[in-house]
Curated annotation (Swiss-Prot):
This is Glycine--tRNA ligase beta subunit. SUPFAM superfamilies: HD-domain/PDEase-like. It holds the Pfam family tRNA_synt_2f. Tetramer of two alpha and two beta subunits. It is found in: Cytoplasm. One of its GO terms (molecular function) is ATP binding. Its EC number is 6.1.1.14. HAMAP family: Gly_tRNA_synth_beta (MF_00255). It catalyses: tRNA(Gly) + glycine + ATP = glycyl-tRNA(Gly) + AMP + diphosphate. Belongs to the class-II aminoacyl-tRNA synthetase family. Keywords: Aminoacyl-tRNA synthetase, ATP-binding, Cytoplasm, Ligase, Nucleotide-binding, Protein biosynthesis. One of its GO terms (biological process) is arginyl-tRNA aminoacylation.
Length: 693
């Protein structure tokens, strides 16, 4: 018959962001354990609250699957004595396997015969195997761990109780001094300890004690109550899914309620109000049907409706205090000019090994100026870029950002507009921080995009020059994210940004203002920074599901513009299914490999047709001449088509021509032919890294 197993790990309150990943980990480890133990089951179902991590396993088999395996013993030569009797070695082997010499058979392995026996291992009862779930529970890993008592065991929070049931029987084991049983704990204030009669009665038992253990059901209940409240008041309650997930993991029995704040606080920018409610208080904010912010908020209580008015009043009081601070800072900040704030930045350190924020802005101004010109920004955009890059960090020393650090850039844009800065300048101040995550929103304006690239480039250059380089998972200055940001912006804008261009920008800034680099002189060995950025390029491109060998090929050429690497990968992926792809790549790869053996030819070197010794040399030269002129201006897909058109000529050429001829002039002429073709293939990286079968 099928069985149901339940394991509940009762804990002190777990941080909300840890709950879901932890119970998912428990599911994965339970699944792995059952499979390794050869126990059939239907499903592993997770339940979780801030005080418990639970799995329920349905459809469990009665016992492990039986297995029959072969055990290898000594060689036949050792197993039999000179008279053909079983030796002590053979007898000891079968005794250890629980069989007799009558069960022996021989099998050859690498030319030698060995003793083998078949060994039947009956499956253990599931009740006996499930005691091993102790190790599963103890093996969970968490972002932060703690110890308690006098032991060395580490866990997310102290374990307070354990429930382990196979149907209606307790599965006995012990973690530290906590023994498994059937007694669970209800809601901290509304419930009490209660016995779970059987594994399949877990949810309904907890519901009697005001605990909704199914996180999905709990979240749906929160959403329903929010929807009912919105309908009742004709509101639009903005439900951020991440916030809903967090709130769901803060409560065991949710009750949604609404509160309000004074309308006078609506004069404070919406971004500040929303941050105060959403990020600081975990409230959902409310708008009217036209999207205008209303002086109301919605929150979730971990409990029922008893004395709810006191809860509402308490939350209103806390929010009012925060909004009063925000209103004060907003009004106070406007008493000073942008120039005042910029002046203060001269005394604020960006990093003690790098310099002040003001010095960083001066470097970024030079980098942005160079990049803006190279990328073809208009005169107006260049003017706005120059202004934005000299003030874009000013809001860091405002009172508002001091209190709400997550509003940096956002308040800069708001204050810049209030002080009459051009729209492009104001927008760029906010967009400079984009993207704020590996998949975050990108700058839309050209000014903001260049400013963002310049700032990130300066940070990477400065920290690498100061030898503060990310290693392993350690990246305290988010340099990986900043490199990803540069690449993603370049790809989004379609700009020809490459590593050589970025190095050129740094060298330009250094030449213009060497004093700004007194602590972070541009490093002469750029291979480490190049590898760092190329790794991020590969990471971005991998999101497009390109083949690994195609990725390796296109990122192998470090000087290629990022957008070209993307286009090359797209074209190679498209043509990888062509019938002749293998032959084309093999022909071109043969060219590139031999071209590497060529001496250094000058840029003005020309192929000497008088040194040709067979028709294939002339045919290939003629074919190359036809395509070379238009190749540079062709689109990437057309370039691959052009290279493919040379396949037959290249194949015939190699069939008829000995490249490494005895005559030095002839040999070099042939190598020059190959070098010129190989140079065209470099638009696709290193084709010899492609795997073709």
């Amino acid at each position: 018959m099928a069985h149901t197993f339940l394991l509940e790990i009762g804990l002190e309150e777990i941080p909300a962001h840890v709950v879901t990943p932890s119970v998912n980990q428990l599911v994965q480890k339970t699944t792995k354990f059952l499979k390794e133990q050869r126990i059939d089951f239907d499903e592993v179902i997770p339940y979780s609250t801030p005080r418990r991590l639970t799995v329920k396993v349905t459809g469990l088999a009665d016992k492990q699957a039986d297995i029959e395996e072969e055990a290898k013993g000594p060689s036949k030569k050792i197993a039999l004595d000179d008279e053909g009797n079983w030796s002590k070695a053979a007898q000891g082997f079968v005794r250890g396997q629980g069989v007799t010499v009558d069960d022996i058979f021989f099998k050859e392995l690498k030319g030698t015969e060995y003793v083998y026996v078949k060994k039947f291992i009956p499956g253990k009862p599931v009740s006996e195997v499930l005691t091993g779930m102790k190790d599963v529970a103890m093996d969970l890993k968490f972002p932060t761990m703690m110890r308690w008592g006098s032991n060395d065991f580490e866990y997310v929070r102290p374990i307070k109780w354990l429930v382990a049931l196979l149907d209606d029987e307790v599965v006995p084991f012990e973690i530290l001094d906590i023994k498994t049983g059937r007694t669970t704990q209800g809601h901290r204030f509304l419930g009490e300890a209660v016995d779970v009669p059987s594994a399949d009665k877990y949810l309904e038992t907890l519901e009697t004690q005001k605990v909704i253990a199914d996180a999905g059901v709990r979240k749906a209940e929160i959403r329903k109550q929010i929807d009912d409240l919105a309908t009742e008041n004709n509101w639009n309650i903005v439900v951020d899914e991440d916030l809903l997930e967090e709130v769901n993991n803060l409560v065991e029995y949710p009750t949604v309620f609404a509160g309000k704040f004074k309308e006078e606080y609506l004069q404070v920018p919406n971004e500040v109000l929303i941050t105060s409610m959403k990020d600081h208080q975990r409230f959902f904010y409310v708008t009217d049907k036209d999207g205008n912010l209303l002086p109301n908020f919605v929150s979730v209580r971990n409990g029922n409706k008893d004395y709810l008015e006191n809860v509402v009043a308490g939350n209103e009081k806390v929010l009012t205090a925060r909004l009063e601070d925000a209103k004060f800072f907003y009004e106070e900040d406007q008493q000073h000019t942008i120039a005042d704030y910029v002046e203060r930045l001269k005394k604020v350190m960006f990093h003690d090994k790098i310099g002040t924020i003001y010095e960083k802005m001066e470097r970024v101004n030079l980098l942005a100026k160079f990049l803006g010109n190279k990328l073809g920004l208009s005169e107006t955009e260049l003017k706005d870029l120059d202004r934005a890059s000299m003030i874009y960090k000013f809001d860091l020393v405002t009172g508002m950002v001091g209190e709400f650090s997550e509003l940096q850039g956002i308040m800069g844009e708001i204050y810049a507009r209030l002080q009459g800065e051009d729209d492009n300048v104001s927008t760029a101040i906010r967009e400079e921080y984009m993207p704020t995550s590996s998949e975050g929103e990108l700058p839309q304006s050209n000014v903001g995009a260049v400013l963002s690239i310049a700032d990130k480039l300066d940070s990477i250059q400065s920290f690498f020059a100061a030898n503060m380089i990310p290693s392993g998972s350690n990246d305290p200055y988010a340099l990986r994210r900043q490199a990803l940001g540069i690449i993603r912006i370049a790809l989004d804008k379609g700009w020809d940004i490459s590593l050589p261009l970025l190095h050129e920008a740094i060298n330009y800034a250094y030449a213009e203002r060497e004093d700004l680099y007194k602590n972070t002189q541009p490093i002469t060995n750029v291979s480490e920074t190049d590898s760092f950025v190329i790794d991020r390029l590969a990471q971005v491109l991998s999101g497009n599901k390109f083949r690994r060998d195609i990725l390796d090929a296109v990122v192998a050429r470090a000087d290629m513009p990022f957008i070209q690497a993307l286009q090359a990968a797209q074209v190679l992926s498209k043509h990888a299914e062509d019938d002749n792809f293998k032959e084309v790549i093999e022909a071109l790869t043969r060219v590139t490999r031999l071209a590497k053996k060529a001496p250094e030819f000058g840029s003005d070197a020309v192929i000497d047709s008088t040194l040709f010794e067979n028709d294939t040399e002339k045919v290939l030269a003629d074919e190359f001449a036809k395509v070379e002129a238009g190749y540079g201006d062709a689109e990437m897909n057309e370039k691959f088509t052009i290279l493919s058109s040379l396949k037959d000529s290249i194949t015939a050429y190699f069939d008829a021509t000995m490249i490494m001829a005895d005559d030095e002039k002839v040999k070099n002429n042939r190598l020059l032919q190959l070098v010129k073709i190989a140079e065209l293939t470099e638009d696709f990286g290193s084709l010899d890294k492609l795997i073709v079968k």
